[in-house]
Amino acid sequence: MEDFLGNIDPKTLEELYQSWKINPHSVDEGWQKFFMGFDFALSDTFGQGSTLSDLEFKVIKLIEAYRLRGHLFTKTNPVRARREYKPTLDIENFGLEQKHLKLKFKAGELIGLSNATLSDIIERLNRIYCSSIGVEYMYLREPKLINWIQERVEPTLNHTEFTAKEKKHILYHLIAAVGFEQFIHKKFIGQKRFSLEGLEALIPALDATIEHGAEQGAREFVIGMAHRGRLNVITNIMQKPFNEIFAEFIGESYDDESTLGDVKYHLGYSNTVETDYGKKVRLHLVPNPSHLETVGPVAEGIARARIDDEHSGDVKSLIPIVIHGDAAVAAQGVVYETIQMSRLKGYSTGGTIHIVLNNQVGFTTNYTDARSSTYSTDVAKVTLSPVFHVNADDPEALLHVIRLAVDFRQTFHRDVFIDLLGYRKYGHNEGDEPRFTQPLLYELISKHPNVRDIYTKYLIESKFISSIEAKQMQEQYNDLLEKHFAKAKENPKIKIKHFLPEKWNAYRYSQSSDFEESPQTGVSADIIENVAKLITDIPEGIPLFKKLIKIIDERKKNYNDGKVDWAMAELLAYGTLIYEGHNVRLSGQDSERGTFSHRHSAYSIQGTEEKYYPLQLIPNAKFSVYNSLLSEYGVLGFEYGYSVALPEGLTIWEAQFGDFHNVAQVIIDQYLSSAEDKWGLQSGLVLLLPHGFEGQGPEHSSARIERFLTLAARNNMQIVNATTPANFFHALRRQLKRDFRTPLVVFTPKSILRHPKNVSLVKELENGSFQEVIDDNKVNESAVSRVVFCSGKIYYDLLQRKEELDVDDIALVRIEQLYPFPKSQVDRVLDRYPNTKKWLWIQEEPKNMGAWNFVKEFFDDVPIEVISREASGSPAVGLSKIHSLEQAEIITKVFRPCTCELKNKYCGLQCEEGSKRFERKKQFEYLDNK
């Protein structure tokens, strides 16, 4: 016999009973109910005298087994028998026999039966735990959560008795769900739509979530889902006009000719709808790519921004809903990252309702090959979230679970999962043949009626509706679709509407001319002074770490001397924006302090776990900084979503090292760089990516500048490699000083954060704007023979050598913004040096990386050459000594004196001897070849 409660024996149970007699509240609520009204000491029914009957205890174990494992024996699969699990719930596995079925047991009190027979107890347990609903919850650890669920599923037999009106309402949504799919299948034969057929019960489920959620205080819902069933949701739930969907099937062009667009089942939508009880709620279906589960963190970020902004932190006002596929939720790592965020202060949205569309197959992969876990939803156990498994052919059971899920979320502000078991009527898409890979399953599916017909039959047989009325409902819905279809044919042009228009209607799309010159972003001296004081004045009575005090004092001294370093300029940018009424949010691994211990936006108070945030003292807006969980993909997706929902705020994600951003490459590729082209969706998100070659090896050197430049087109992002604190200050402020939003990627410094020359004057923050190009102001223009273009940290290496040699005829020109490339400003630089003989692009990255392959196209009027590291598959060497040799060779090539008959001041390898030198043919030799 399986010992389901191996840590509990009759003696322990007796001790619990004795404790309860002394103090009823000394045991949890479940045991209180069991012992209440019992007097086991007087019971000799089974000859046990003053101890609990052994048989009684066995029945208790049976009850606990149903609670713990009943979900394994449910009738939740609509098309085939489920897997068998051992041991079963047969009474023989608990030391009980058939002869005990007619005996009465007081243990029935645990599930609401007084002095019931074992047969009655088992019948009740099967109805509660082994019907169309399976409940996983006994792992939740917190008694209040377990008791809450038991109190709602056991007395009700895990069932809701719906009224005739409610049943018709369910039927209407099933008619809509099934009718929509069948209509499209008939009108647009063979076109991909990723139908919902086999899981149409999702539509009444979402309707119930919104209706019941609104009654429980929700005024807004953010929905993230992939393509399966999306068109059905966007019409029947989001109430996007049918004719607009049909136009997306028919149409051949967009009303805005500059739009690149996306397939119809990726587009987002926002709308205000009215519930059956007259409450207006706001719905948002987040646009998404085909990359499964990426939309999860994006939806959570949007939800958090709306909660912070629109709902003043009230999580009950907004409910996020994330809809998964069974194969994806079980296998995609970003799901784990997102779920781990759910209870963290910087990322919590007060609980998400997760609905898994479980069609038991992933493209062509059987569920037995798609996961090692029992359920696709087993990731829910990570955050101790309950899971309800439901048969998709039982819509009333599903709506019962939906109400439970909404109530649980609104009560405990935690995630809850619904595993909706159905099937996929067709292949992965409508042109796919599933019988190649699942012949037995699709033989069953081909004979299986849809949920609309199943439920209609039940209502007719139960006298809730007549067959004529049911037929009329279907005909009316189909007539509605026909009218919209005719309307779509009249005007088939496709219009992509703004997602979250209430936030974005005030913004326009950018034009190329917007990037020719940056707007003024200076701040008055008084405001800067006030913010600087907050940052550098430590309130009395707050004990801080001595080294931190030294850093703050150094900042104060520099500021009083009229100078700011990189970190101070950054904090001043945030503080001045907050002063002007803009929220600022920064998150990333170690972002409070900064990876390189430079930022210190939060001061840890000695002897406590508390922190002091100077910028949070500015009253006009909110400053939030969070050390993120060790995630790039999930967190960047979250911050992207946050930026989309709060364009008037500054949202920043910082990588620990820029090298690690590629863990989140999907978010960069599918959202950050392309969302405006695909969905008309702007974002002002800032990425801070520490970058620079300093001998730390191939994984701590490169933020992959070249990758971002490859993605750059149509003004879809700004790529900055700033070299001064002031320019960084203006780049950050520029994000909020224009009437459009474009992502900003900043390659931030590491070793030069404390470089004595990497400082700016406070006056540079008070006036001016971001400088896309910084020319050399310490040269004799007419005497310049060599112009060196560079970007980022290598400038300081070049500057050091230039000053050591006291050179005034080599100009060092910094390209501070790589994209949009400042062509007109660069041309003005070229015109400034008429006597130049050599034009160089210098970079510390390998030739096939960095900016060279991008920028060289813009120097079409001059014969520019590159000096860099040799092309390589790996960004950097592993040994510090070799790194130093490489770096020295790059710098040396710029300033090497000429020794040939040409008598140039600097060697350009232009003479006959130079052209034959080994180094000319293999320019990347790190040591001199003489």
Go through each PLM region and give its residues.
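Flexible, glycine-rich loop/tail regions that form catalytic "lids" or insertion modules at the edges
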Residues: 54-64, 68-106, 144-145, 156, ...
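Conserved phosphate-handling catalytic cores of large alpha/beta enzymes
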Residues: 362-373, 381-417, 422-427, 435
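Cofactor-binding active-site loop characterized by glycine-rich and histidine/acidic residues
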Residues: 219-384, 388, 596-649
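Active-site pocket-lining segments that scaffold enzyme catalytic pockets across diverse folds
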Residues: 179, 183-243, 553-556, 565-583
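Subset of Sec-pathway N-terminal targeting signals
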Residues: 1-38
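Active-site cores of enzymes that catalyze phosphoryl transfer or operate on phosphate-rich substrates
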Residues: 158-180, 251-300, 304-311, 614, ...
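Alpha-helix capping and helix-loop boundary segments enriched in small/acidic/polar residues
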Residues: 4-7, 50, 193-200, 282-293, ...
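Extended, charge-enriched "interface" segments that sit outside catalytic cores
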Residues: 34, 38-202, 218
